Structures are given as C-alpha cells and as structure tokens.
Amino acid sequence: MISDFNVDPTAFYNIYKTRDTPENIKSLLCEGNESGEGVMQCFEIAPGIQITYNDLNMDSCFRPLRFEKNFLQINHCLEGCYECELEGGAVSFLGEGDLCVDYLSKDKQVFLGSRIPLKKYRGITVLLEMETAQKTLDNGFQQANINLEQIKDRLCSDGRSLIIKSKHEIDHIFSELYSVDERIQIPYFWIKVIELLLFLSLLDGSSVRHPQQFSADISKRTQEVYQYIIENPFMKETIPDLACMFGVAESSLKR
C-alpha cells in the first residue's frame, strides 16, 4: 500500500544518497514529466545495501549526475527495455530477463543519457555503496567471503557495463523477489542479496558479455521504425520492408 511508504516527490537519484545508518526501511520516490510518470519503491536492507522496485511509464527520467561515492549497481529487467547512451555516442540496451552489472564511479560520468523506448520498464535494482556495503557484508555474513572489489574488477574491469543473459539461476533469484510476501520482505531481501552476490562471485566468461552497442544513427532509425509501428498497428510490412524504408540493416532491427 502506498500509504505505508514515506512519499518523496523529488528526483529518482535520491537512491544514491546513502547513509551509514538507514533512516527509513521503505520509501517511495515518484517522478513525472510530459512523457509520463514512474514510481520507485526503495527498501534499505542494511547500511550500504538497497533494493528498488522500478515501475516506469515514461520515455526518460535521465539527469546527469556525479556520484559522491562508488557504487556497484545490479539491474534486472522484468518487462520492457532500457536504453543507455555511452561515451562516443554508442547506445546499449537492457532487455527482458537480462541482468546488468555497472560500476558507478565518483570519478567518472558513466552514462551520457538514457531512454525507455517502449515507455515501459519494470525491474529491480540492487544498489551497493562499495565501502559501506563491504563492511556490512564482513560484519553480517563473513562466512560468505564476498569481496565487492573482486566482483567489480572481474565483471566491470574496463569500466563498462556487463550484461548477463537470462538463465536459470537469475530467473530463480529474481522471480521470488517479485513475489515475496510483505511480512518477510526485509530479511528475505537480505538472503537474496547474499545469494545474488555469491552467484556473481562464481560467474565465468561463458555466461557474460558486454552490452550490444549501436551507433547513434542506428539507434535513431530504429526508434523511427518503432514509432511507425505504433502509429500503424495494422501494417503489413515485414522486417525487410521496414529495413529498406528506414535505411537500416535487418540485423539491427532484429536485435
């Protein structure tokens, strides 16, 4: 129930303003613009560790941001897709069932922009403030021997995002997070965060890849195709037809 949350109408980027001692177990962040609105339900699991449920029905909620601390951010997409603009003008996508691991450094602007092409994105973000979260893990679950720096160095060694395509272990972890009983949410979240980090600690190269990147021109043409489909729902054109109409390769549209 929304009434159970402390409503904060400010920007979504409040999730990056971490505290050593969480003040609110749950909070609700609401934001809107001319393209739509979105809601984030945030749960502070422990110092430096947060889970956010994202329900965004808008074409963008991006604002440039310099982080005050270093974060490991893990995003899982349940529905829709999310597009990020990277340095050099390339664009990458997070699609349904994918898991994305990002290292957000206070010394570097990682993302130059973002869009929600379908104006629909539902998913979960696990956010760990590196220093504080490591202390929490060492004190609360030392037997797991989880090292966030090692996870970051192995999965995001060159500063880029990492995409892990949908697989059984990911589906198992997150399917239960989307349906957990409210009465046991916080302790259950803690268990699932540990499970997720242990899973990431064991990943090898066969399960991971860097996000597919597209040039700004291909991204723009693909968006024009999408808009054409939305405006002409009963169209008869095939993918080859659309590729020819908009001057983009069939392989790019299929991806």
Report the location of each language-model feature.
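N-terminal low-complexity or simple alpha-helical regulatory segments
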Residues: M1-K69
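Catalytic micro-motifs at enzyme active sites that drive phosphoryl/nucleotidyl and oxygen chemistry
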Residues: M40-Q41, C61-L65, G88-G89, V110-I116
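Short hydrophobic beta-strand segments that form the core of ligand-binding sensory/regulatory domains
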Residues: Y53-D55, Q73-N75, R122-E129
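Glycine- and acidic-residue-biased ligand/ion/polar-headgroup-sensing regions
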Residues: E68-A90, G97-L99, E129-M130
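Alpha-helical bundle regulatory/interaction domains
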Residues: E85, L94-S215, I239-P240, C244-E250
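Short, leucine-enriched amphipathic alpha-helices that occur as contiguous helical runs
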Residues: I218-Y226
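Short helix/strand-capping hinge loops at secondary-structure junctions
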Residues: N232-K236
